[in-house]
Design a protein with these regions (language model features):
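Charge-rich, low-complexity N-terminal segments
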Residues: 1-120
Length: 120
């Protein structure tokens, strides 16, 4: 049996989008309450009954959240233009080697705007 496991995380951060068009509201300093969904997919282990241990996903994501929470995202290497697309790809790059079966990162910047990233 195959299954997908998703774990949700949140962080608060400020940002500017320096490459947004002149006059765009996101060029100025602003912040979001971000929600991140990390999904792994694979075969369910017949012994444990799970695809992957939730705690291991949390352990991989926790140091990243510590770096991002209440930060100015533009100051973080790789997030100089921190669009939700770039944030999703950044998480993927950091987690791919730590989370076997990583299949999707979703970054929500508002309740109605999100980016779904499934690797390059």
């Amino acid at each position: 049996m195959r299954a997908r496991l998703t774990k949700d995380f949140t962080f608060e951060a400020a940002q500017t989008l320096p490459n947004a068009p002149e006059g765009h509201k996101c060029r100025g300093m602003h912040g979001h309450s971000f929600k991140i969904e990390v999904s792994v997919e694979g075969d369910v282990d017949p012994k444990t009954g799970w695809v992957y241990d939730h705690a291991e996903i949390g352990a991989a994501v926790k140091p990243l959240l510590k770096m991002l929470d209440h930060s100015y995202l533009n100051d973080i290497e790789g997030l100089e233009n921190p669009t939700i697309e770039e944030i999703a790809a950044w998480f993927w790059g950091k987690l791919q080697s730590q989370c076997p079966g990583l299949c999707e990162i979703v970054v929500h910047e508002t309740p109605t705007a999100r980016c779904v990233y499934r690797g390059e």
